[in-house]
């Protein structure tokens, strides 16, 4: 996922990773 490889997004949306 793009979000999971983007640290700020991953931090804000851990449930998708």
From Swiss-Prot:
Residues 5-7 are annotated as: Ser-Xaa-Pro motif, crucial for potent interaction with nAChR. The modification Pyrrolidone carboxylic acid (Glu) is found at residue 1. Keywords: Acetylcholine receptor inhibiting toxin, Amidation, Disulfide bond, Hydroxylation, Ion channel impairing toxin, Neurotoxin, Postsynaptic neurotoxin, Pyrrolidone carboxylic acid, Secreted, Toxin. The modification Cysteine amide is found at residue 17. GO terms for molecular function: acetylcholine receptor inhibitor activity; ion channel regulator activity; toxin activity. Its main location: secreted. It is found in: Secreted. The modification 4-hydroxyproline is found at residues 8, 14. Expressed by the venom duct. Disulfide bonds join 3-9, 4-17. The keyword DNA damage does not apply. InterPro entries: Conotoxin_a-typ, Conotoxin_a-typ_CS. The keyword Ubl conjugation does not apply. The cysteine framework is I (CC-C-C). Alpha4/7 pattern. Alpha-conotoxins act on postsynaptic membranes, they bind to the nicotinic acetylcholine receptors (nAChR) and thus inhibit them. Belongs to the conotoxin A superfamily. This is Alpha-conotoxin In1907. It comes from Conus inscriptus. The lineage of its organism: Eukaryota, Metazoa, Spiralia, Lophotrochozoa, Mollusca.
